[in-house]
Amino acid sequence: MKKTLIGLFLVLGAASFADAGKIEAKGGIDLGGKYHYGKNYKNQKVKKSSGEIGAEYRYEVTPGLEVGGGTAFQFHKDLKDKVSGQNLKNYNSFPLYGTAKYTFDTQTAVKPYVKGDLGYSFNNGDHDYGNVGKFKAKGGAYYGVGGGVNFNNVNVELMFKENKGKYEYEGPLGVKSKYNADYKRVSLGVGYDFNLGN
């Protein structure tokens, strides 16, 4: 949570020095979310309650093209699939990322757009299962790509997103190993743009 607050402070701080631009408050739900571990472990689905809340600051650099940055608290640690010998829970994420958004001028109130995010995911989800062993979450790259529509400052979008991650495992006898834990999903999001400046 501390990383999310720092990220929001950076986003709002950048906006306070800007003459124009916008802040978007947003949230979303995950569709088909699943952790991918590689060939040695079984992939696991997350619960339907997974999603995110966050904020972005963007400013227009050329007509239709906005760039900026954002952060979010993404909650997806709770697993629907329980697999013997694997985590009972995984990690939540706090990404910090740059973003680019292009809105098409349709000469109507409804304007479609495409969007891409790229940054780093701070993953939080260490677990100690006693005799089974300890699992420590590590961060990795974060990206998202997709599109949506804007109507009267309201954005509705559909994006494919991935948080790269790893787990370090330490067994009861001190045996250590690492494995990938990449979280992939389609995100259905809704946001509202607050315009700054003139």
Show the residue positions of the predicted features.
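Repeated loop/turn-to-beta-strand initiation elements of outer-membrane beta-barrel proteins
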Residues: 23, 64-67, 107-110, 151-158, ...
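Membrane-embedded beta-strand positions of outer-membrane beta-barrel proteins
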Residues: 23-27, 69-71, 98-100, 114-118, ...
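Outer-membrane beta-barrel translocator domains and adjoining extracellular loop/strand segments
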Residues: 35-45, 79-87, 124-134, 166-176
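Residues that define the transmembrane beta-barrel architecture of outer-membrane proteins
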Residues: 21, 45-53, 90-96, 110, ...
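Predominantly the C-terminal beta-signal and adjacent terminal strand-loop region
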Residues: 36, 74-80, 143, 148-198
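Sec-dependent N-terminal signal peptides
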Residues: 4-13
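Short glycine/proline- and aromatic-enriched beta-strand/turn motifs that initiate or cap beta-hairpins
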Residues: 18-59, 100, 118, 125, ...
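Glycine- and aromatic-enriched membrane insertion/assembly motifs of diderm outer-membrane
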Residues: 22-31, 41-96, 155
